[in-house]
Structures are given as C-alpha cells and as structure tokens.
Amino acid sequence: MNKKFFSLAAFALITLGAQAKVKLPHILGDNMVIQQNSEANLWGWDKPGTEVKVATSWSSQKYSVKTGKDGKWAVKVLTPKASYTPLSITFDDGDQTTLNNILAGEVWVCAGQSNMEMPVKGFGNCPVKGYNKAVVRANQYKGVH
C-alpha cells in the first residue's frame, strides 16, 4: 500500500513540476501603464534553468533570460513614447502568457490636504493662469474626456 502511495505521489509531483508556467508579480498585468521612453523592469518566476523569452508589440526586439537556481528571472525592455494605442507583452517558456491593453505614458500620484481641493479655475483671488484655454484645448487630445 505504502509503495503504491509513494509512487503515485512522486508521479504527481513530477507532473506538476513539468507544468511550470511563467509567474508574474501582481503589479504586472493586463490594463497597466508602463513608463514611456525608458527601460522597464519585468520579472517573475519559473522552473529553475528555464529560458523565458519576452516579446513586446511595439518592437521587433526579442529578449531572452534564463531563470536562476531559485527560479527567479528579470529583464529590462525598452518602452515606446506615450500613446493611447493598446500594447501587449508576451512571456514564453514554451507556454505563452500575454499581458494585454497596456498603455505607455506617465502615472502621477498626487497627495495632499487642502491644497488638493483647488478647482482648475483656481480660487477667488488665486486664479490659475490660462486655465480656460487649457480646458478648451483639452478636447483636441485623444483620450481626454
């Protein structure tokens, strides 16, 4: 009985190990924004010694990296200029994983208290210079609603 159990358990572990797939951190996923005109760090995990190929929809350049003994891998990819065109990144270790609907651009994080409640037009004695022209021109830019 024990011999059958251990044989079955060993088979199950070998089978599960053979099905390793690129794992990515939660910060990398569909619908993300990547920094424009830079080198973006991409990383993840896979079976130790596995070659992971990375391809981006905005470039013909292919990247290849081999996982370390701990299964970790990392690569830097060149990113395009800002655009509203959806992009994708494909990771391939023999089983493809693709991240879709990625935009290249800037993400600004603003924090504050009372200074964060100022309207675009400013306050009574503190107007924002040129705000009305900026608001009118905003509609000419794709993606500004």
Language-model segments: which ranges?
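Exposed boundary/loop context
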Residues: 5, 10-13, 37, 64, ...
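Intrinsically disordered, low-complexity boundary segments flanking structured domains
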Residues: 9-13, 96-97, 129-136
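Secondary-structure boundary elements
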Residues: 114, 118-145
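Non-catalytic, glycine-rich low-complexity segments
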Residues: 19-48, 102-110
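Extended acidic/polar, glycine-enriched regions
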Residues: 43, 47-126
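A generic structural signal for short, non-catalytic loop/turn and secondary-structure boundary residues
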Residues: 17, 92, 102-103, 137-139
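Bacterial Sec-dependent N-terminal signal peptides
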Residues: 1-23
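Flexible, active-site-adjacent loop/turn segments at secondary-structure boundaries
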Residues: 22-26, 30-32, 97-100, 114-118, ...
